[in-house]
């Protein structure tokens, strides 16, 4: 009997070792397992934070969901938010959702989009795109281009939207994608390096908005974190998006780091970020570079002595800091629409 118990214990130990070994191997030879786990963080249901304001706003907004746009990539759908009673072509806000490049969905900004359309009378386009690692850089910025081309070429849409007044924006990874696309439209050499033609004229691009965007990604090579989970998260996202385990030395990392690719033609920009578990130092570097170029910038950051403000804080409308950021964003859009 004692011998049988020992055999069972030994078998269990060997099984656990085998499973742990397989997990470690899976996590080190491919980004897919870790990317799946990270994507689950962004897969929860959409929760309305300020139901009172949202319920009022949605009475005055028309939402068309899951419109298909031509693209070689999948997840090529978009949602359109327009003010009711729109009598003339209106300013167009094109928004790219966040999710660490590996997750997220266009529906995540439903509350924000509905309120902004009601308050500013712009049209708001929320775009889906194929996430990493199924599609690696620069797939997402090129898929955004597919969506913009669709919006410009569709005759019915051209009658409703004023492409002479286009605002690009995004949150988290989507902010980086959106502002990279803005850099492509305003920097011919940069566009050439990505093999992309410019679709929007400089004068058509009125402004950009970055909510917690990683705008200077090369900084993460030098950042030290005591958190194993944070290191794992960063490595997963970078490996998945840039397509190489040696992402720290990749040319793609330099290309997606936008501070060195903007010029004086870049449009006026609103930037905000939190001071923990986010990319505030990258946002600050980007804002400082724009100011050096005499580009109009409005920013909202939080110093270390202020309260802790986490990544994507701006959508938690139950908090005063999110409410204030929304007001600043609304005023910014009204000024440049």
Language-model-derived ranges and their functions:
Residues 1:
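Tryptophan-rich substrate-binding surfaces of secreted polymer-degrading and adhesive proteins
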Residues 4, 8-337:
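Alpha/beta-hydrolase superfamily serine-hydrolase fold, recognizing
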């Amino acid at each position: 009997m004692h011998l049988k118990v020992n055999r069972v214990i030994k078998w269990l130990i060997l099984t656990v070792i085998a499973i742990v070994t397989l997990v470690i191997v899976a996590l080190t030879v491919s980004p897919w397992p870790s990317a799946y786990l990270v994507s689950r963080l962004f897969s929860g249901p959409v929760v309305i934070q300020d139901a009172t304001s949202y319920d009022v706003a949605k009475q005055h907004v028309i939402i068309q969901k899951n419109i298909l746009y031509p693209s070689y990539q999948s997840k090529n759908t978009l949602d359109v938010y327009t003010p009711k009673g729109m009598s003339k072509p209106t300013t167009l806000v094109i928004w790219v959702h966040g999710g660490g490049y590996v997750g997220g969905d266009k529906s995540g900004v439903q509350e924000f989009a509905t309120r902004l359309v009601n308050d500013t009378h712009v049209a708001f386009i929320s775009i889906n795109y194929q996430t990493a690692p199924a599609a690696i850089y620069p797939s997402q910025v090129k898929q955004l281009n597919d969506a913009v081309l669709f919006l410009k070429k569709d005759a019915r849409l051209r009658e409703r939207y004023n492409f002479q007044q286009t605002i690009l924006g995004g949150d988290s990874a989507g902010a980086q994608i959106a502002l990279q696309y803005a850099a492509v439209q305003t920097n011919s050499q940069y566009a050439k390096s990505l093999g992309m033609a410019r679709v929007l004229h400089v004068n058509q691009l009125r402004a950009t908005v970055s909510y917690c965007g990683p705008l200077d990604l090369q900084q993460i090579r030098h950042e030290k974190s005591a958190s194993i989970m944070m290191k794992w998260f960063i490595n997963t996202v970078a490996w998945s998006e840039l397509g190489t385990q040696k992402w720290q030395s990749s040319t793609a990392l330099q290309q997606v780091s936008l501070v060195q690719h903007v010029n004086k033609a870049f449009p006026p920009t609103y930037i905000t970020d939190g001071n923990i578990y986010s990319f505030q130092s990258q946002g600050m570097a980007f804002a400082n570079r724009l100011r050096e170029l005499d580009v109009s910038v409005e920013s909202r950051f939080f110093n270390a002595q202020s309260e802790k403000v986490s990544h994507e804080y701006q959508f938690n409308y139950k908090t005063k800091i999110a409410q204030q950021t929304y007001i600043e964003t609304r005023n910014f859009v009204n000024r440049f629409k």
